[in-house]
């Protein structure tokens, strides 16, 4: 790293009182748009109001003003999250059996919702144990609270109030930084300073403070809880923080204070900063001393990372230099020009972040079962299934959003004259090769993965089981996956000799059971997994094909060379040009959402059945008795098996839930099917049909002299599609949710 002359001094500049605080203005619907502010003449107005309220690009073209609005909106977003969290903690304090659950987490089920006795719906308050009647929850909050050392409802109340105080502060912050002291554009574009502060401050100090909490509060409290001490007898958090002797009784190295730290004898601290691997056999969760160690290590790494970028001192990296130096022999100008894109297009920035965090959320979904981070999480099957499903859906939506904002960037913010022969330009120029190859891959994967199932269904139907692909006939073992599992099982002996076991028991090793229930065991992979994994590959590639085609052809195509002029969303390329409908970038996102839904559905079905068949169950003297008795390997290799032994067999709980505490899931299952079916009305019918119908209804109103002042209009083609896809996804997700929960709460 060379020492250079400092960059131009960064001055923190804010503009004082840039926008007047005016309740009169806010009270006027559509105040952000000249057209909308005039008020409604047709019913289209309300749709445009919702479409454009947060599309800050449509309010102004001034990047500084857009940046301030986004920045201010983030404060509001954080406030909403804090209010929601506060509500969760309040429910835990006011309406839950948390203290009872804490004293016996293996037999008592978590509940933090009590239904009021109106029209007989108190039937939903099932007996969850510990003399408590309520709705069983599957959010994992109880497990998080125990891991963080919360032992009483008073602590939950206090945290709930703290959340509301923080929410108030963020709301004031959002108002203050837009109306009183708004940052200038230069501040939003100062990426080096932003990286330093976010890496060292948010992630580094955030992880450090959490590690401190874990070490001084969570670890001692959980150590005592694991030993069976009554929560009411355990000292309060501030006693552990203020009285070192208390901690030293549990972790002797505390008596030595900071001496080992400054004398570099760090191994002295290994009684509370461990590197064990595997799960705590008492709770079935990761060792909390491992996770404290992890957060401390993350803090150190990110605090160092937050000192890497060059600001007012002449040392460190410049992001522009890094990007412009990034070129190889075959990549033309490399990343030259990307710095300008990422500092002037927040859509480009957002697309990258959504792609990254979407992928990360999907990785989190897998870690939540493979390395369950909280005590008693692994044996709470309803929560495990809910957390996996939730993070998979969220990840799918974020990745689809990445494609949406990448396309918006190309339509609204991309300037081809400044991007010549860099990697982005080169990708756009050979987009035909990319898309046609990807299309071929999708066809190959589709025919081959589906073909294996069709073969099996045919052989099964003809009574020829010996000719099927299965673990007992023609084997297609996932040998690469099995090799990876084996390698990871053996890894600790070589790479981490002090670790007691590998990172996850799913790789291999010994079963962990808590209270007679399986927490985790090595997950066997066979022919049925090989087949469904290729369906995963197929659905994911098709989703990517649709979304990537939308991005790469967002500005132009052979069919519509001037697509950029038509905008991000448009129904067709004007009258007189047939065959040009559904080509806008928005339409690709619309279509991509359906395939995203396909992809995630297959994944969560696979997970749900696989875990019930091969992992979850009870441990007896004869071994493990799984919920569905290992039927995945025999049945999941035919389409008929998926329909009969998964969907139909496991739907019995939700279909037969009427008259029980689970009956709400039966109603949701039914209602969500209706919502899903309702979406088809929007997706399968044309706009003209509705306009004709509306006009005859308006005629009838005129006859009766009750005609509305605001003229009714059919939804535009794009509005109709948006309503359709929203109900399709909402209906589908809620149906799956009811199906999963009724099933797993009954049998888990």
Swiss-Prot record:
Catalytic activity: reduced [plastocyanin] + hnu + oxidized [2Fe-2S]-[ferredoxin] = oxidized [plastocyanin] + reduced [2Fe-2S]-[ferredoxin]
EC number: 1.97.1.12
Single GO cellular component term: chloroplast thylakoid membrane
Binding site residues for chlorophyll a': 673
Binding site for chlorophyll a: 681, 689
GO terms for MF: 4 iron, 4 sulfur cluster binding; chlorophyll binding; electron transfer activity; magnesium ion binding; oxidoreductase activity
Binding site for phylloquinone: 690
Keywords associated with the record: 4Fe-4S, Chlorophyll, Chloroplast, Chromophore, Electron transport, Iron, Iron-sulfur, Magnesium, Membrane, Metal-binding, Oxidoreductase, Photosynthesis, Photosystem I, Plastid, Thylakoid, Transmembrane, Transmembrane helix, Transport
Superkingdom, natural source: Eukaryota
Membrane-topology descriptor: Multi-pass membrane protein
Transmembrane segments: 70-93, 156-179, 195-219, 291-309, 346-369, 385-411, 433-455, 530-548, 588-609, 662-684, 722-742
Compartment(s) where it occurs, according to its Swiss-Prot or TrEMBL record: Plastid, Chloroplast thylakoid membrane
Record-listed [4Fe-4S] cluster binding positions: 572, 581
Matching PANTHER family: OUTER MEMBRANE PROTEIN, OMPA-RELATED (PTHR30128), PHOTOSYSTEM I P700 CHLOROPHYLL A APOPROTEIN A1-RELATED (PTHR30128:SF19)
Entry's family note: Belongs to the PsaA/PsaB family.
HAMAP family: PSI_PsaA
General function of this protein: PsaA and PsaB bind P700, the primary electron donor of photosystem I (PSI), as well as the electron acceptors A0, A1 and FX. PSI is a plastocyanin-ferredoxin oxidoreductase, converting photonic excitation into a charge separation, which transfers an electron from the donor P700 chlorophyll pair to the spectroscopically characterized acceptors A0, A1, FX, FA and FB in turn. Oxidized P700 is reduced on the lumenal side of the thylakoid membrane by plastocyanin.
Protein name: Photosystem I P700 chlorophyll a apoprotein A1
Organism: Chaetosphaeridium globosum
């Amino acid at each position: 790293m060379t020492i250079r002359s400092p960059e131009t001094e960064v001055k923190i500049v804010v503009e004082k009182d840039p926008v007047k605080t005016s309740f009169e203005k806010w009270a006027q619907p559509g105040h952000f748009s000249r057209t909308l502010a005039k008020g409604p003449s047709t019913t289209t107005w309300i749709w445009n109001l919702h479409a454009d309220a947060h599309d800050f690009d449509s309010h102004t073209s001034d990047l500084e003003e857009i940046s301030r609005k986004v920045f201010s909106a983030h404060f509001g977003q954080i406030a909403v999250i804090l209010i929601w969290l506060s509500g969760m903690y309040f429910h835990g304090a006011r309406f839950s059996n948390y203290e009872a659950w804490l004293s016996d987490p293996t037999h008592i089920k978590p509940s933090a919702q009590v239904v009021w006795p109106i029209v007989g719906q108190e039937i939903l308050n099932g007996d969850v144990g510990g003399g408590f009647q309520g709705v069983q929850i599957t959010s994992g909050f109880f497990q998080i609270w125990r891991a963080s050392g919360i032992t009483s409802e008073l602590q939950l109340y206090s945290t709930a109030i703290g959340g509301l105080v923080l929410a108030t502060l963020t709301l004031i912050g959002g108002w203050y930084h837009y109306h009183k002291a708004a940052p200038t554009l230069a501040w939003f574009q100062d990426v080096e300073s932003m990286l330093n502060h976010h890496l060292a401050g948010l992630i580094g100090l955030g992880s450090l403070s959490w590690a401190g909490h874990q070490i001084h509060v969570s670890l001692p409290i959980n150590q005592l809880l694991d030993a069976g001490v009554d929560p009411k007898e355990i000292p309060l958090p501030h006693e552990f923080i203020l009285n070192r002797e208390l901690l030293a009784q549990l972790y002797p190295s505390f008596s030595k204070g900071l001496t080992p730290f400054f004398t570099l004898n760090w191994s002295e601290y290994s009684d509370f900063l461990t590197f064990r691997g595997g799960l705590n056999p008492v709770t079935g969760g990761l060792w909390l001393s491992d996770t404290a160690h992890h957060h401390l290590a993350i803090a150190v790494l990110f605090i160092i990372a937050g000192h890497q970028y060059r600001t007012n001192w002449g040392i460190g990296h410049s992001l522009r230099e890094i990007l412009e130096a990034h070129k190889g022999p075959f990549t033309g100008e490399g990343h030259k020009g990307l710095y300008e894109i990422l500092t002037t297009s927040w859509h480009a920035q957002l697309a990258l972040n959504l792609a990254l965090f979407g992928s990360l959320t999907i990785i989190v979904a897998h870690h939540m079962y493979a390395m369950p981070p909280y005590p008693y999480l692994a044996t709470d099957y309803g929560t495990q299934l809910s957390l996996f499903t939730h993070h998979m859906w969220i990840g799918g939506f974020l990745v689809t959003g990445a494609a949406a904002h990448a396309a918006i960037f190309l339509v609204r913010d991309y300037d081809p004259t400044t991007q010549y022969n860099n990697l982005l330009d080169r990708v756009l120029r050979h987009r035909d090769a990319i898309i046609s190859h990807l299309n071929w891959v999708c066809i190959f994967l589709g025919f081959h993965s589906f073909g294996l199932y069709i073969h099996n269904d045919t052989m099964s139907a003809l009574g020829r089981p010996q000719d099927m692909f299965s673990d007992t006939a023609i084997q297609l073992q996932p040998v690469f996956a099995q090799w990876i599992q084996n390698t990871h099982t053996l890894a600790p002996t070589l790479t981490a000799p002090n670790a007691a076991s590998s990172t996850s028991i799913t790789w291999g090793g010994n079963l962990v059971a808590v209270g007679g229930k399986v927490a985790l065991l090595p997950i066997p992979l066979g022919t049925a997994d090989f087949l469904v994994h290729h369906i995963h590959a197929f659905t994911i590639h098709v989703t990517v094909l649709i979304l990537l085609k939308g991005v790469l052809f967002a500005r132009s195509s052979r069919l519509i060379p001037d697509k950029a002029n038509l905008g991000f969303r448009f129904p067709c390329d004007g009258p007189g040009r047939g065959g040009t409908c559904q080509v806008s970038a928005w339409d690709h996102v619309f279509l991509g959402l359906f395939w995203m839904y396909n992809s995630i559905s297959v994944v969560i079905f696979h997970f749900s059945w696989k875990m019930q068949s091969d992992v979850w169950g009870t441990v007896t003297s004869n071994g493990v008795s799984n919920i569905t008795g290992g039927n995945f390997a025999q049945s999941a290799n035919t389409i008929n098996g998926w329909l009969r032994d998964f969907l139909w067999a496991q739907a019995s709980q939700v279909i037969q839930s009427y008259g029980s505490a689970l009956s709400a899931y039966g109603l949701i299952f039914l209602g969500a099917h209706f919502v899903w079916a309702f979406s088809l009305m929007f997706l399968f019918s044309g706009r003209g049909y509705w306009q004709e119908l509306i006009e005859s209804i308006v005629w009838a109103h005129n006859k009766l002299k009750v005609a509305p002042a605001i003229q009714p209009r059919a939804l535009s083609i794009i509005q109709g599609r948006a309503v359709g896809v929203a109900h399709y996804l909402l209906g589908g997700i809620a149906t799956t949710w009811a199906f999963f929960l009724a099933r797993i709460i009954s049998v888990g």
